[in-house]
């Protein structure tokens, strides 16, 4: 009888240990799930923040932006209809210690319904050498880029006059279906980043390969970066990058942004 009692006591203690251990594991799983949900929540918020502008892509006729309003905050003066800034550049490492990028920025003033900007060609050097910079003024009329400066190089002139922003041919409406991105958050700035692996079968990737010299078959990475409030801000920085770089020290990417800001800004800020 005493032996049976000892066996029963032993079994009770064993079951209690298993139960406590199970509860501990359950709590750990719940904690992991909560952290995952928190990350997913930020990931969704980043995508939704970008979707406010990316859902407009492709904007084949940029003059449509004159009739579209973005996020307004206290930086806007009463009566200011705001200004859209659209930007695209292609950056690549020609050789170690050297980076060149070429592209265009255009400011579309909704008050005056005019669009002015410039095409830029830049080369940056890692060593003690000042960068080479050249800007060529442009304007847009009837959805056509008009070169205002004299350009001797016929190939460069053609690139400027035929330039298309990424937002004019990109289609990122499927962004909401992207998942399991690599999320990085700095609450102190605040800044938010998320990365997604893209496929070479993606139509956006095919478009970029047809327009730029991309000498690699490597599938690119889609990088989304926000400085400022996720809900929206006229003073924050928001850009999208499609990175084809083969290794860490090389650079081969297309950068795109579309921002909405007060129209009355100093020329130096442009």
UniProtKB/Swiss-Prot annotation:
<feature type="signal peptide">
    <location>
        <begin position="1"/>
        <end position="22"/>
    </location>
</feature>
<keyword id="KW-0472">Membrane</keyword>
<keyword id="KW-0732">Signal</keyword>
<dbReference type="Pfam" id="PF04507">
    <property type="entry name" value="DUF576"/>
</dbReference>
<protein>
    <recommendedName>
        <fullName>Uncharacterized lipoprotein SA0405</fullName>
    </recommendedName>
</protein>
<dbReference type="InterPro" id="IPR038641">
    <property type="entry name" value="Csa_sf"/>
</dbReference>
<comment type="similarity">
    <text>Belongs to the staphylococcal tandem lipoprotein family.</text>
</comment>
<dbReference type="InterPro" id="IPR007595">
    <property type="entry name" value="Csa"/>
</dbReference>
<dbReference type="GO" id="GO:0005886">
    <property type="term" value="C:plasma membrane"/>
</dbReference>
<keyword id="KW-1003">Cell membrane</keyword>
<keyword id="KW-0449">Lipoprotein</keyword>
<keyword id="KW-0564">Palmitate</keyword>
<feature type="lipid moiety-binding region" description="N-palmitoyl cysteine">
    <location>
        <position position="23"/>
    </location>
</feature>
<feature type="lipid moiety-binding region" description="S-diacylglycerol cysteine">
    <location>
        <position position="23"/>
    </location>
</feature>
